[in-house]
């Protein structure tokens, strides 16, 4: 056990996905597959109280282009002082990006905009540096855009372009794994970290403490952290248990 404890730690980001004012989880990113878990402010406060250093906060309505939850996101961030927030969903222009940073997001994930508006993405990557991550949402090696409803190009071509732009960090999601509780796509993560020196955050599929241990094995290769969603909400394990396995 001591050998395991000497390994570098994996940063865990409990997820709070917001749709129609409620904390929800989707299955494979599909609109209409929501399971509701109540008030997002309460959910975020619960993870903060349980020891979270980061929360991955997602505005699903903004991601799907059906309005937004800006006021509610601001409340979530205000109620979780001391916890760093990675904010995602519908960040597609200067207004949405600046608003996310103004309300207290530590880091903002670009998704669709990085695929559909590469010049703008390159500009803000250069301007904001570490405050920008790019979400690479993948089916096979094809990227998914617009709330995962459209194809967004070849993963490796887009990654090469983002590397040239100086992207500071990538959040890699296997869409087929997300919310399915079937384990993360370790092979995909290994392939991505082989192609970048930048840190990678893994997302999608974590179902057990063994999955967290397996992801921790990849930290030395470049996997910095992991987003944990449905497994926490469904009670597969507690956040303190997960943080312990992750090395906190």
Swiss-Prot record:
Its EC number is 5.3.1.16. It catalyses: 1-(5-phospho-beta-D-ribosyl)-5-[(5-phospho-beta-D-ribosylamino)methylideneamino]imidazole-4-carboxamide = 5-[(5-phospho-1-deoxy-D-ribulos-1-ylimino)methylamino]-1-(5-phospho-beta-D-ribosyl)imidazole-4-carboxamide. Pfam families: His_biosynth. GO terms for cellular component: cytoplasm. Keywords: Amino-acid biosynthesis, Cytoplasm, Histidine biosynthesis, Isomerase. The active site is at residues 17, 137. This is 1-(5-phosphoribosyl)-5-[(5-phosphoribosylamino)methylideneamino] imidazole-4-carboxamide isomerase. It comes from Leifsonia xyli subsp. xyli (strain CTCB07). The lineage of its organism: Bacteria, Bacillati, Actinomycetota, Actinomycetes, Micrococcales.
């Amino acid at each position: 056990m001591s050998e395991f404890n000497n390994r570098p730690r994996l940063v865990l980001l409990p997820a709070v996905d917001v749709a129609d004012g409620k904390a929800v989880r989707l299955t494979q990113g599909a609109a209409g597959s929501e399971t509701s878990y109540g008030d997002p402010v309460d959910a975020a406060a619960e993870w903060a109280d349980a020891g979270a250093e980061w929360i991955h906060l997602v505005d699903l309505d903004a991601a799907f282009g059906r309005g937004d939850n800006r006021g509610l996101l601001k409340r979530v961030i205000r109620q979780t002082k001391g916890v760093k927030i990675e904010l995602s969903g519908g960040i597609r222009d200067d207004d949405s990006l600046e608003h996310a940073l103004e309300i207290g997001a530590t880091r903002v994930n670009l998704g669709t905009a990085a695929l559909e508006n590469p010049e703008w993405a390159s500009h803000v990557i250069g301007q904001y540096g570490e405050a920008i991550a790019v979400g690479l949402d993948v089916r096979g090696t094809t990227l998914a855009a617009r709330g995962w409803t459209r194809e967004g190009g070849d993963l490796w071509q887009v990654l090469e372009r983002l590397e040239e732009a100086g992207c500071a960090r990538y959040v890699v999601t296997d869409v087929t794994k997300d919310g399915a509780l079937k384990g993360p796509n370790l092979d995909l993560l290994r392939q991505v970290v082989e192609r970048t020196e930048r840190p990678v955050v893994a997302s999608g599929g974590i179902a057990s403490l063994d999955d967290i241990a397996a992801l921790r094995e990849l930290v030395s290769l470049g996997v910095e952290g992991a987003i944990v969603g449905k497994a926490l909400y469904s009670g597969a394990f507690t956040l303190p248990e997960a943080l312990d396995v992750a090395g906190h």
